[in-house]
């Protein structure tokens, strides 16, 4: 209203050199007051706008803080998920390695099981009642004797050792075989003594057989042969029946042959 009042009409200007009219002064003051009021109103509007802007800025700042906090929580969650994923991958690798080791162990166990099954079948074949392996197959073979040892051992000892090595033969068959071999040896000694010609020897004593003297004649040999035959007949069978492995009988027979020669 004041502006309208001020703008109603043109203000009459005072003369250049004359006194200023009071109405002009009042109008000028009113214009200045109106301008100051408008300026204050504008400043208030600007202040209100600035307050609104400050509130919006504060709201934006709070939103940014919440966003940063959510980002922090998200980053922590992602870090935990990554750590869990690494642990899961390590557990998966360990489980795979264990599976590989178990597969190798299973293969070894299968191989051992196959060997055990094969050995079990072999034992079944070995110890089967119908076809049982004789005990002589598991005995250690005797060491071979040299020529010197064989020469020292008598023929009866060799026969006795051969008889003892065969465990499957009964005792009666061994005794019969030894008796038969003894009789054969006696017969061979008889033939050897009857076929050889030389000086007659005195009848042998049981302690030591006598040696032949150089002055004996060859004519007395036929007379001494009947005396030798009855002495040699009973001795070898008795020795073979009582103790077939005794070396005295073989040595005595060899000494008798040397004495006859």
From Swiss-Prot:
Keywords of the record: Biological rhythms, Cytoplasm, Isopeptide bond, Membrane, Phosphoprotein, Tumor suppressor, Ubl conjugation
UniProt entry tagged with the keyword Transmembrane helix: no
Biological-process GO terms, alphabetical: circadian regulation of gene expression; cortical actin cytoskeleton organization; negative regulation of fermentation; negative regulation of phosphatidylinositol 3-kinase/protein kinase B signal transduction; positive regulation of ERK1 and ERK2 cascade
Main localization, broad class: cytoplasm
Superkingdom assignment: Eukaryota
Molecular function terms from GO: protein kinase C binding
Chain residue ranges for the region called Interaction with CAV1: 135-203
Pro residues bias: start-end ranges: 200-212
Record field: compositional bias (Acidic residues): 158-170
Description of post-translational modifications: In vitro, phosphorylated by PRKCD.
Modified sites of kind Phosphoserine: 62, 70, 165-166, 173
Keyword Ubl conjugation: yes
UniProt-annotated location(s): Cytoplasm; Membrane, Caveola; Cytoplasm, Cytosol
Induction per the UniProt record: Down-regulated in breast and lung cancer cell lines.
Quaternary structure annotation from Swiss-Prot or TrEMBL: Component of the CAVIN complex composed of CAVIN1, CAVIN2, CAVIN3 and CAVIN4. Interacts with PRKCD and with phosphatidylserine. Phosphatidylserine may form a bridge between PKC and PKC-binding partners and stabilize the binding. Interacts with PER2. Interacts with CAVIN1. Interacts (via leucine-zipper domain) with CAV1 in a cholesterol-sensitive manner. Interacts with EPS15L1.
Domain notes: The leucine-zipper domain is essential for its localization in the caveolae and for its interaction with CAV1 and EPS15L1.
The protein's name: Caveolae-associated protein 3
Organism: Homo sapiens
Lineage of producing organism: Eukaryota, Metazoa, Chordata, Craniata, Vertebrata
Gene this chain is encoded by: CAVIN3
């Amino acid at each position: 209203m004041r502006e309208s009042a001020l703008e109603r009409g043109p203000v009459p200007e005072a003369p250049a050199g004359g006194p200023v009219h009071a109405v002009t002064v009042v109008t000028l003051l009113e214009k200045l007051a109106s301008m100051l009021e408008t300026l204050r109103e504008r400043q208030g509007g600007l202040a209100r706008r600035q307050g609104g802007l400050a509130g919006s800025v504060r709201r934006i700042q709070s939103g940014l803080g919440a966003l940063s906090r959510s980002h922090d929580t998200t980053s922590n969650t992602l870090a935990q998920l990554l750590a869990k994923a690494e642990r899961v991958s390590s557990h998966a690798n360990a489980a795979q390695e264990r599976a590989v080791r178990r597969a190798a162990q299973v293969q070894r166990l299968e191989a051992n099981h196959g060997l055990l099954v094969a050995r079990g079948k072999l034992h079944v074949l070995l110890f089967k009642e119908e076809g049982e392996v004789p005990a002589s197959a598991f005995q250690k073979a005797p060491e071979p004797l040299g020529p010197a040892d064989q020469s020292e051992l008598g023929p009866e000892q060799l026969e006795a050792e051969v008889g003892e090595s065969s465990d499957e033969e009964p005792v009666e068959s061994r005794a019969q075989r030894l008796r038969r071999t003894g009789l054969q040896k006696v017969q061979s000694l008889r033939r050897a003594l009857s076929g050889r010609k030389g000086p007659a020897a005195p009848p042998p004593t049981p302690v030591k057989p006598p040696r032949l003297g150089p002055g004996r004649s060859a004519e007395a040999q036929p007379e001494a042969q009947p005396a030798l035959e009855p002495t040699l007949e009973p001795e070898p069978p008795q020795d073979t029946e009582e103790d077939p492995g005794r070396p005295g009988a073989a040595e005595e027979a060899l000494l008798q042959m040397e004495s006859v020669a």
